[in-house]
Amino acid sequence: MALAHATYRRLLGPTWSPVAPERLRRAVGGKVVLVTGASSGIGEATSELLGRNGAHVLLAARRGEVLDEVAGRIRAAGGEASAYAVDLTDLDAVDRLVHDSLADHGRVDVVVSNAGKSIHRSLADTTERFHDVTRTNALNYLGPVRLLMGLLPQMRERGSGHVVDVNSLNVDLPAANWAVYTASKSAFDAWLACIAPEVRVDGVATTSIHFPLVHTPMSAPTYDPALPALTVDAAAQVVGRVLVTRPRLLIPWWVRLAAPVQAAAPEVSDAVTARFLRRKDR
């Protein structure tokens, strides 16, 4: 399995490979980096990676006791970390996070917007569960927007900063049974794309990473762990790389090829998917 995961990562190409540690230390050393969804998965691995490389990591997630454990590991390894228990669906709590992080540290240099809710459910199974739509949008779109609206002004005033959006290739290749999730992730991706030129004028970079499958606790209920995918540590290395290279967008090369085909012939794509779903339901 490890060989399959390593091969998968190599197939993504050099822009998805780990960056040299000394380059990462130069990019994040001494900076205050806020990571949402830091209690598990990509957020946890990213927080530990950045902590090892000189960043003061602000860990944000709902589970305060787990955040304390992550912060403890970062400190034990010689890094700096502060934990903030917050539910990003609670906009008042998001405002408190903005206030407390700036009051405690004076600034936030980088935001890694990683927290998210994945939901794999058909339209039929969602019809009586509209709360799935509202909660998923609250966590994947509204909460991150509120957070950045609070933190971007101080970045723009200083003339520096970086926002990294940990997103999904579902944004580029919409798939059946992923409507609620994909719509929420696409909304934040579009919002960030729209503000990117506005904040770039003031020295603030934005990066959207459209990840392929990553084996995380969030993906575990849906995907077989034997499927080739990125590990959370490999995904964290990708986040580390974009903090150095600062691209506007990072997506797998094969998505760049497939997305135009799907856009040019959506009827064909829909027909193939519908045929697959009919077979699956038999």
Task: Set out the residue ranges of the language-model regions.
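Conserved glycine-rich cofactor-binding loop
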Residues: S39-S40
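Non-catalytic terminal and boundary segments that flank Rossmann-like NAD(P)-dependent oxidoreductase
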Residues: M1-G29, T273-R282
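C-terminal helical subdomain
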Residues: S208, D224-A263
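The beta1-alpha1 cofactor-binding region of Rossmann-like NAD(H)/NADP(H)-dependent oxidoreductases
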Residues: G64, Y84-L97
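Conserved glycine-rich Rossmann-like NAD(P)H-binding loop of the short-chain dehydrogenase/reductase
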Residues: N53-V70
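Active-site helix of classical SDR
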Residues: L148, S184
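Conserved mid-core segment of classical short-chain dehydrogenase/reductases
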Residues: S118-T134, N177
